[in-house]
Amino acid sequence: DHASMNNDLFQQARSAYVSKDYETALAQFTNCLQDTSAALAPGELGMLYHQIGNCLVKLHDPNEAIHAYSQAKIDTSYDAQGSVNYNLGMVYASQHDYDDAVTYFQMAIDDPKYQTPHKAYMGLGNSLLKIGKSAEAGAAFRSAALDETNPDPTKALLNLGVCFMALDRPMDAIASYESALQFDMAPAIRNKMFANMGQAYVAAGKMNKAVRAFESALADKTY
């Protein structure tokens, strides 16, 4: 009499998922869910629905994915609710439903157990930008950049600069870009950063600096 789900089946499903065989993974996770010989322990229902949702996202079935993630949220013993909320935010954003996306990204951020808030802050900022809330988006990108779990703050700082430009604050945009330049980044991103910086200097009426920034953007830094 098992006190939890069929672990062999679960491991098979996980390895199918890792091998990008999402159809098989979906079928096997669903089997774990429907296996009556094993009563699910607290948290396992949420974990299975979370994995099923991930499979459905990979299989480009957003509506069913939303349904699965919503089922996962019902299992309050499941620890990774922050991740489920983040995934819901991503699915809603992919469907251009930015208001719902904002709600779920915020829920992920508010969850103290959620380990990677910078990801939810990035999702939140991008969704807020889409609905024209540049100031709130900027605050979200700033939080993403400052999150010490963020391995690469450059994208957040680049987006923060974009928000400042939308708010007609070019000098603040320049400060964001300059703080980003201390980090390693791909040449294409670095060139974009210099081009954005050039535009910000133009907006601030500093033409000499604008020219220098544009020259840096055009000079191939790949050696």
Question: At which residue positions do the language-model features occur?
Answer:
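N-terminal leader/linker segments that initiate helical-solenoid repeat arrays
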Residues: 1-47
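Canonical tetratricopeptide repeat
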Residues: 44-47, 51, 87, 123, ...
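TPR/TPR-like (Sel1-like) alpha-helical repeat modules
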Residues: 178-182, 195, 199-223
